[in-house]
Amino acid sequence: MSEFKRLMRLKLKMKQKRPEFKRQDWFKCSRIGTSWRRPFGKHSGMRIGLTHRAAVATVGYRGPALVRGLHPSGLQDILVNNVKELVALNPEIQGARIAATVGKRKRIEIVKKANELGIRVFNVSKQKQDEFLSL
Protein backbone atom coordinates (compact mmCIF):
# COMPACT_ATOMS: atom_id res chain seq x y z
CA MET A 1 0.00 0.00 0.00
CA SER A 2 2.91 2.33 0.63
CA GLU A 3 3.91 2.04 -3.04
CA PHE A 4 0.40 3.11 -4.04
CA LYS A 5 0.52 6.13 -1.72
CA ARG A 6 3.96 7.05 -3.04
CA LEU A 7 2.68 6.94 -6.61
CA MET A 8 -0.37 9.04 -5.68
CA ARG A 9 1.93 11.66 -4.14
CA LEU A 10 4.14 11.53 -7.23
CA LYS A 11 1.07 11.97 -9.43
CA LEU A 12 0.09 15.08 -7.46
CA LYS A 13 3.60 16.55 -7.72
CA MET A 14 3.68 15.89 -11.45
CA LYS A 15 0.29 17.52 -11.86
CA GLN A 16 1.48 20.62 -10.01
CA LYS A 17 4.55 20.89 -12.24
CA ARG A 18 2.67 20.15 -15.46
CA PRO A 19 2.17 23.30 -17.55
CA GLU A 20 -1.21 24.40 -18.78
CA PHE A 21 -1.25 23.29 -22.40
CA LYS A 22 -2.84 25.96 -24.52
CA ARG A 23 -3.53 26.14 -28.20
CA GLN A 24 -1.01 27.93 -30.39
CA ASP A 25 -1.86 31.65 -30.82
CA TRP A 26 -4.77 31.38 -28.37
CA PHE A 27 -4.16 34.97 -27.29
CA LYS A 28 -4.50 36.40 -30.80
CA CYS A 29 -8.09 35.45 -31.42
CA SER A 30 -10.59 34.89 -28.62
CA ARG A 31 -12.97 32.75 -30.65
CA ILE A 32 -10.53 29.86 -31.01
CA GLY A 33 -10.24 29.43 -27.24
CA THR A 34 -7.44 27.86 -25.23
CA SER A 35 -8.34 24.19 -25.64
CA TRP A 36 -5.32 22.13 -26.68
CA ARG A 37 -4.66 21.43 -30.34
CA ARG A 38 -1.36 20.10 -31.58
CA PRO A 39 0.56 22.61 -33.74
CA PHE A 40 1.16 21.31 -37.27
CA GLY A 41 2.55 24.39 -39.00
CA LYS A 42 5.64 24.01 -41.15
CA HIS A 43 7.42 26.94 -39.48
CA SER A 44 5.81 26.61 -36.07
CA GLY A 45 8.23 27.35 -33.25
CA MET A 46 5.89 25.66 -30.83
CA ARG A 47 5.93 22.43 -32.89
CA ILE A 48 9.72 22.50 -33.14
CA GLY A 49 9.97 23.00 -29.38
CA LEU A 50 11.71 26.34 -29.12
CA THR A 51 12.37 27.18 -25.50
CA HIS A 52 10.61 30.54 -25.54
CA ARG A 53 7.39 29.00 -26.85
CA ALA A 54 4.60 27.31 -24.93
CA ALA A 55 4.95 23.67 -23.91
CA VAL A 56 3.59 20.95 -26.18
CA ALA A 57 1.80 17.96 -24.66
CA THR A 58 4.09 14.93 -24.88
CA VAL A 59 4.35 11.48 -23.31
CA GLY A 60 6.77 12.68 -20.65
CA TYR A 61 4.03 14.61 -18.86
CA ARG A 62 1.99 11.47 -18.10
CA GLY A 63 1.57 10.28 -14.55
CA PRO A 64 2.50 6.85 -13.17
CA ALA A 65 0.67 4.05 -14.98
CA LEU A 66 -0.67 2.34 -11.84
CA VAL A 67 -2.51 5.43 -10.62
CA ARG A 68 -3.34 7.03 -13.95
CA GLY A 69 -7.01 7.90 -14.30
CA LEU A 70 -7.80 7.49 -10.61
CA HIS A 71 -9.59 10.08 -8.51
CA PRO A 72 -7.24 12.06 -6.22
CA SER A 73 -8.62 10.00 -3.33
CA GLY A 74 -7.15 6.89 -4.97
CA LEU A 75 -10.52 5.38 -5.92
CA GLN A 76 -11.75 4.51 -9.40
CA ASP A 77 -14.28 7.03 -10.65
CA ILE A 78 -17.43 5.17 -11.79
CA LEU A 79 -20.36 6.95 -13.44
CA VAL A 80 -23.68 5.93 -11.91
CA ASN A 81 -27.13 6.49 -13.41
CA ASN A 82 -29.27 4.53 -10.96
CA VAL A 83 -29.27 2.59 -7.70
CA LYS A 84 -28.82 -0.73 -9.51
CA GLU A 85 -25.46 0.41 -10.91
CA LEU A 86 -24.46 1.70 -7.48
CA VAL A 87 -24.99 -1.68 -5.81
CA ALA A 88 -22.46 -3.29 -8.18
CA LEU A 89 -19.61 -1.07 -6.91
CA ASN A 90 -16.85 -2.19 -4.56
CA PRO A 91 -16.52 0.55 -1.89
CA GLU A 92 -12.87 -0.28 -1.18
CA ILE A 93 -11.59 0.52 -4.67
CA GLN A 94 -14.43 2.39 -6.40
CA GLY A 95 -16.31 5.61 -5.86
CA ALA A 96 -19.47 6.88 -7.53
CA ARG A 97 -20.06 9.93 -9.67
CA ILE A 98 -23.73 10.59 -10.32
CA ALA A 99 -24.49 11.35 -13.97
CA ALA A 100 -25.58 14.88 -14.84
CA THR A 101 -28.81 13.64 -16.40
CA VAL A 102 -30.05 12.14 -13.12
CA GLY A 103 -32.87 14.12 -11.51
CA LYS A 104 -33.17 15.18 -7.90
CA ARG A 105 -35.49 12.36 -6.78
CA LYS A 106 -33.24 9.60 -8.09
CA ARG A 107 -30.14 11.50 -6.91
CA ILE A 108 -31.51 11.45 -3.36
CA GLU A 109 -32.13 7.69 -3.62
CA ILE A 110 -28.59 7.12 -4.89
CA VAL A 111 -27.03 9.18 -2.09
CA LYS A 112 -29.05 7.33 0.57
CA LYS A 113 -28.09 3.93 -0.83
CA ALA A 114 -24.44 4.97 -1.16
CA ASN A 115 -24.44 6.02 2.48
CA GLU A 116 -25.84 2.61 3.48
CA LEU A 117 -23.25 0.75 1.41
CA GLY A 118 -20.36 3.00 2.45
CA ILE A 119 -19.66 4.18 -1.09
CA ARG A 120 -18.17 7.62 -1.60
CA VAL A 121 -20.04 9.96 -3.97
CA PHE A 122 -17.61 12.38 -5.58
CA ASN A 123 -19.88 15.02 -7.06
CA VAL A 124 -22.22 15.62 -4.13
CA SER A 125 -20.93 17.89 -1.35
CA LYS A 126 -21.13 16.90 2.31
CA GLN A 127 -23.76 19.57 2.90
CA LYS A 128 -25.93 18.25 0.07
CA GLN A 129 -25.47 14.68 1.30
CA ASP A 130 -26.62 15.67 4.79
CA GLU A 131 -29.56 17.50 3.26
CA PHE A 132 -30.51 14.48 1.12
CA LEU A 133 -30.17 12.06 4.03
CA SER A 134 -32.48 14.16 6.19
CA LEU A 135 -35.26 14.04 3.58
From Swiss-Prot:
Molecular function (GO) terms for this protein are:
structural constituent of ribosome
Q: Which GO terms describe its cellular component?
A: cytosolic large ribosomal subunit
> Which Pfam families does the UniProt record give?
Ribosomal_L32e
Tell me, what is an example of a GO biological process annotation in this record?
A: translation
The record's keywords, sorted A to Z, are: Ribonucleoprotein, Ribosomal protein
Source taxon at top rank: Archaea
Q: State the similarity comment.
A: Belongs to the eukaryotic ribosomal protein eL32 family.
Annotated protein name in UniProt: Large ribosomal subunit protein eL32
